[in-house]
């Protein structure tokens, strides 16, 4: 049993979880966001999005100043009050975006894998793919430590592609709609554990953690949480955890921010 009155951290994915996958609406979650804010519970956004995108969304959601996890854990944006931490304002794990681009271009040219990265197109095309405005779409291209792409080849070739990436110290991660390439050393779980440890060091007590996500790339995050909400999502693969004890994990009946609200209701309203 736990409550929002005890030391608590909430980690949340964005698209398909806190935000509607199509409209990007978050209003169904607004009452809980306000309640968590009033209780001084940090809501830490955790996504495949770039830090530039997430800082914009963080401000829109009233969460500015808190830490966040970008690019599937390859980038940690530090909290405003953590200015004494080495690397402030951001910690980047693994090789850079430009280095990953070089690897992908070589694989495409020499081994003929078929894919389109966000670097291959302009913001108008990304806006068409995502439904974002062009100004918001431009923020999706500001990667620092990963590459987002659309796979346009066979499943057989994908297996070969993943094997080649792994040989080169990279990983291929499936999001709600796109695929992401990042350093094998990075991950939402490692980033979350680092943030949890930092809060513990600052307060002297390990906070209880609750994570919410809807896609396969959220599984590593949810695995390291004390409690997890798997929001009903669009991805056919879904989310599967090693420990799905009903006392720890809740699968929602609703999608997006309504599912987010349902998950918070489940764990807190009856407590």
From Swiss-Prot:
NCBIfam families associated with the record: HAD-SF-IIB, HAD-SF-IIB-MPGP, MPGP_rel, PRK03669.1
Example of a GO MF term: mannosyl-3-phosphoglycerate phosphatase activity
Top-level EC class as recorded in UniProt: hydrolase
Compartments, record wording: Cytoplasm
EC number: 3.1.3.70
Matching InterPro entries: HAD-like_sf, HAD-SF-IIB-MPGP, HAD-SF_hydro_IIB, HAD_sf, MPG_Pase
Species for this entry: Escherichia coli O127:H6 (strain E2348/69 / EPEC)
Cofactor: Mg(2+)
Keywords associated with the record: Cytoplasm, Hydrolase, Magnesium, Metal-binding
Residues at the catalytic site: 13 (nucleophile)
Domain of life the protein comes from: Bacteria
Any single biological process term in GO: mannosylglycerate biosynthetic process
Pfam families named in the record: Hydrolase_3
Matching HAMAP family: MPGP_rel (MF_00617)
Residues where Mg(2+) binds: 13, 15, 214
GO cellular component: cytosol
Protein name: Mannosyl-3-phosphoglycerate phosphatase
